[in-house]
Amino acid sequence: MDGTNVRHWDSWIPGHPDFGVQRPWSPNPDNVKNFFETGIKNTTSLSFAKGGEDYSFRATARASQNAAVVPNAQRDVYDLNISGEIDLTDNVSIYSSLNARLQQTDNYASSGYGSLASNFSQWWQRQLDMDRLEKNYYYNGAFYTWNRRSARNARPQYWDAPHFEQYWNTNANENSTYSGNFGINIDLADGLTGNVEVKRRAYTRHNWSRSYVGVNTLNTTPGYSEGSYNQSFNQLLAKLNYRTDITDDLDLNAIVGYTADQNKWVSTSARTVGGLQIPDFYVVSNSKDKPSYSTIRTNTKYRSAFANVSLGFKDLLYVDGSYRFDWGSTANPENNRIETYQVTGSFIFSELIDIPSLTFGKIRAGYAESPIFPGAYATNQTYSTGTSYGSLPSMAVPNTLANPNLTGGMRQETEYGFELKFFDNRFGIDFTYFDREDSNLPVSVTAPASSGYSRLSVNSKITSSDGVELAVSGTPVLTDNFRWDLSANFATLTKTVDFIYPGIDRVILNSWLAWSSMDLQEIVGEEWGILIGRRSRKDANGNTVYRSNGTMAYDNNQIHGNIMPDATGGITSTMQY
């Protein structure tokens, strides 16, 4: 971009005042910046609370209107939170809560490849003037963009103008989230209490989008799609809790309980095919050809029974132990129970030593197990339905063969750590080291071609992980009217694939061969998440090797690294006045 006078994209618009006019070929550093707008958020809230000797009630309502940073985008959010508790008798109380959120969104920019973000960051041109694009992308009834196919063909080579995407290829979605519970507490005897609680969490999403077609647009077939997604989680929890002081120095807390969980997920989508019968009338029933429909349903159930015992000695030493049974509907029904246990201990040594600067000090260690059940419908053959061929329905056989003998796996983890606080809690350190192994994991492996399937689900994979977690917090400034808190965290995680299946030492997790000749794989003996792909060939001196036709030579199946970060962390700063 040396400032040479050239014809820019808008100099090819017929009838435009700048038709045929040349301008300098120079960079415009603010071209992407000028597309975005200042976001504005308005929030209104109302709270109410009331209580007495035997009841309490609280309600909060909040409305938020958000004008987004991209043009023609808006998001409105409405929240309602209600909670209350009533003592029915001296020994019985009930409680309940409801949390609801409605979120309505218009024309938020999507993410991923093909989105505005991908356009700006990967394919954009720095000489473009965003103000000219906004004013001229729609001119005299036709659409124009910066990457026209040729001097005589104004259709985009790859991208419509960004403002066309925001004002003409519109989308909308509405999300509803509800969660609530109802429970009862009963004092059964001295130190013995009972609790029964039911919980429900539900999420619903509806979305609509249209693909507009006009003169010179990238799309040549108009379309419309809509979908709904419903997810719910229901849980029943019942437990007995016994607490007593065995001696003046030793206290006991014991819990036995039972949980029943149910998860449901339903996805329904529909889109037009072949265009629209009536132009600019965006409903699925206006499809020129038979519309495409898709529905997916997933139901899973889990049950658990557990017991926990905690012992505390002189507020110095604590020991906890638990044992539980878990049943999962996604495993073989004849072998779907997993037994696990957990033992932890902690010692508060700051109670025994007198260090003026030390406010609190604790060391801890523990061992825990947890179940890992397979995904839904891995034990039963399922078939997907497709678009009917005339009056004949169509169904597809899955590529992965179901395994009716599939069971759950187990995670075993050991953890050590300490927690220190100094100077009346003005400075703190929390450190943890963990070492875990996941065994008997359900994994999809390559199946023999003679089976008619490409993959098979089996229980065999073993992975091991270790890492550290460090959190540091402090209050550098503390006065009567001002408080400044700082916190930082740092963590590492190394996950290694130890075993997959006899005769199989790698599994392809994802593939982008069409774009980058790259696979995401797990390989025995390597850290999880290896990127495998082609790499330019080098000679013994590190020079790039070229073929006889002048093109670069490549070697396939080369390791480029893995997707796991060396470390993660963050810093939080909070000021209160």
Task: Tell what function each PLM region has.
Residues 403, 534-536, 540-543:
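Solvent-exposed beta-strand/coil patches in large extracellular/periplasmic or lumenal scaffold regions
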Residues 50-54, 63, 313, 422-424, ...:
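A generic beta-sheet turn/junction motif
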Residues 83-92, 97-102, 153-211, 222-522, ...:
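Extracellular/periplasmic, surface-exposed regions of secreted and cell-surface proteins
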Residues 1-71, 109-112, 127, 136-171, ...:
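Residues embedded in well-ordered regular secondary structure
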